[in-house]
């Protein structure tokens, strides 16, 4: 009997400690409660954002705070990337990162200066485990700045899993006041054939019926595979900056076909941002999340069935429900129907267009330039039409490869310098 009670108490103790570890709250890295200009998982031009960007009011030199008792594990000084950056390890298996700093506190700055002299190098990327530079929660460790690849003064802050080095959503560890769900800006449907070709993207008109529920009507689509795109963004209290969506799910006739929860990212996957966003809309400053695509299954925050596609048979109707949420659980919902009509017509290429199959190696030729593509370089078949433009003032010719509106994904561009 006592053995059973002891085992029960041990189990409760372990469960209790595990809950504490998962709900460990950190201090904010700036005094008071700073405003966000960028959040975790946000769609950037070339990558998914792996941290939070805190506003500093256009100023440099604000004290940066140690968010939890820890030790300096790494220091980096660079003209690019995070610029002057600190990495602190903490109990509980997490590492915090502070980027674009203007300077370090004297205890750290003295060590960094000695390393620079010894290596005869301004740029430093040093393991600091032997220096035992420990700080308590609330201590000032550095000052905010604009170093590295920064577009203006701000603090970039990350939380990482120390063992896997995956980036974790810092808002899981910070107390956030937010009472408004994500905004719904638009809904798009992409009808896809077996080859990967599609009809021009169709926008679904939806109306806010109250309580953040948006309803659309019955949308006629070619029978076959249909992908859903959601134009959405989020805001936090007292900030005008558009932020990325935390949670997004799609259900077809009650069955979940896509689910995204931005809690964790692997750095070797952040380049897949162009599989998660509609690039054509992004160029027009619209954030449209694509909830379909075979490559999406590689992203840690994403889970999908059948590539996230909705199967619509001829003369059938499919009920679609889309749920969006922020990390505080504030939600918005979209509901509409897809009605299957005639299948897609056979693809016809216009002059100058070429169909690139994703599973085959191929090449594009235009004037004196050739672009070679390896097999699987593209997520889906793409119809492209390369064009060459010249800028005489800097002797640069640019080859831009555009999709023609007949395919799922846009092409890419590359430059050739003379």
Q: Where in this protein do the model-derived segments appear?
A:
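Bacterial N-terminal signal peptides
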Residues: 6-17
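Short beta-strand elements
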Residues: 328-352
């Amino acid at each position: 009997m006592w053995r059973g009670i002891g085992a029960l108490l041990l189990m409760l103790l372990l469960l209790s400690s595990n809950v504490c570890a998962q709900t460990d709250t950190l201090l904010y890295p700036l005094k008071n409660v700073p405003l966000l200009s960028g959040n975790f998982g946000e769609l950037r031009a070339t990558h998914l954002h792996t941290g939070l960007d805190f506003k500093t009011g256009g100023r440099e030199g604000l004290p940066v705070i140690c968010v939890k008792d820890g030790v300096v594990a790494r220091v980096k000084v660079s003209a690019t990337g995070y610029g002057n950056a600190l990495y602190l390890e903490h109990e509980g298996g997490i590492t915090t990162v502070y980027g674009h700093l203007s300077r370090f506190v004297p205890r750290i700055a003295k060590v960094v200066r000695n390393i620079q002299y010894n290596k005869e190098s301004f740029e430093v990327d040093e393991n600091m485990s032997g220096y035992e530079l420990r700080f308590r929660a609330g201590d000032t460790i550095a000052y905010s700045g604009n170093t590295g690849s920064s577009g203006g003064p701000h603090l970039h802050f990350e939380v990482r899993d120390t063992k896997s080095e995956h980036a974790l959503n810092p808002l899981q560890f910070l107390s956030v006041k937010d009472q408004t769900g994500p905004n719904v800006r638009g809904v798009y449907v992409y009808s896809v054939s077996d080859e990967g070709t599609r009809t021009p993207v169709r926008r679904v008109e939806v109306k806010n019926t109250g309580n953040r529920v948006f309803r659309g009507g019955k949308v006629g689509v070619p029978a076959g595979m249909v992908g859903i795109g959601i134009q959405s963004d989020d805001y936090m209290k007292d900030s005008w900056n558009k932020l990325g969506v935390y949670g997004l799910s799609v259900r077809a006739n009650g069955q979940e076909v896509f689910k995204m929860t931005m809690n964790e990212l692997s750095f070797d996957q952040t380049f897949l941002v162009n599989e998660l966003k509609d690039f054509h809309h992004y160029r027009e400053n619209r954030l449209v999340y694509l909830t379909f695509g075979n490559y999406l299954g590689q992203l840690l925050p994403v889970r999908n069935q059948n590539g996230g596609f909705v199967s619509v048979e001829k003369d059938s109707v499919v009920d679609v429900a889309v749920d969006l949420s922020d990390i505080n659980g504030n939600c918005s919902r979209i509901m509409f129907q897809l009605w299957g009509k005639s299948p897609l017509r056979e693809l016809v290429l216009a002059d100058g267009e070429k169909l690139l199959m994703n599973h085959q190696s191929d090449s594009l030729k235009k004037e004196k330039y050739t672009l070679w593509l390896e097999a699987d370089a593209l997520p889906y078949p793409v119809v492209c039409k390369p064009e060459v433009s010249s800028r005489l003032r800097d002797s640069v010719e640019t080859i831009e490869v555009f999709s023609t509106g007949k395919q799922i994904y846009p092409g890419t561009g590359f430059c050739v310098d003379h």
